[in-house]
């Protein structure tokens, strides 16, 4: 009787391990994404016509027309960039 219980428990553990491996391989091989990524709701980054520079006070010059300054590392010249698209970042101000 004791032999049958041990065999049953070993078989149960073996089935559980196979089940977990099967679940992992099915989810790891799936090609579908969890969120839709259509081009209708994507964000497009565009460079503006102006550059931005750092002044003697250590402050970057402002970009015009809804653009913001992008610079790399310790460079003193950057490019103005604008984001267009369907994005909804929360405002720090409370809604009225």
Swiss-Prot record:
Residues 1-28 form the signal peptide. Disulfide bonds join 48-67, 52-69, 63-80. One of its GO terms (cellular component) is extracellular region. It is found in: Secreted. Keywords: Disulfide bond, Glycoprotein, Secreted, Signal. The keyword Metal-binding does not apply. Glycans are attached at residues 51, 74. GO terms for molecular function: C-X-C chemokine binding. The keyword Secreted applies. It comes from the Eukaryota. Salivary chemokine-binding protein which binds to host chemokines CXCL1, CXCL2, CXCL3, CXCL5, CXCL6, CXCL10, CXCL11 and CXCL13. This is Evasin P1100. It comes from Ixodes ricinus (Common tick).
């Amino acid at each position: 009787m004791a032999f049958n219980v041990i065999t049953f428990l070993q078989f149960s553990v073996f089935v559980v391990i196979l089940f977990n491996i099967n679940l992992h391989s099915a989810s790891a091989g799936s090609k579908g994404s969890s969120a839709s990524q259509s081009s209708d709701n994507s964000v497009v980054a565009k460079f503006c016509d102006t550059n931005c520079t750092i002044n003697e006070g250590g402050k970057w010059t402002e970009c015009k027309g809804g653009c913001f300054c992008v610079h790399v590392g310790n460079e003193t010249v950057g490019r103005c960039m604008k984001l267009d698209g369907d994005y909804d970042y929360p405002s720090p101000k409370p809604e009225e």
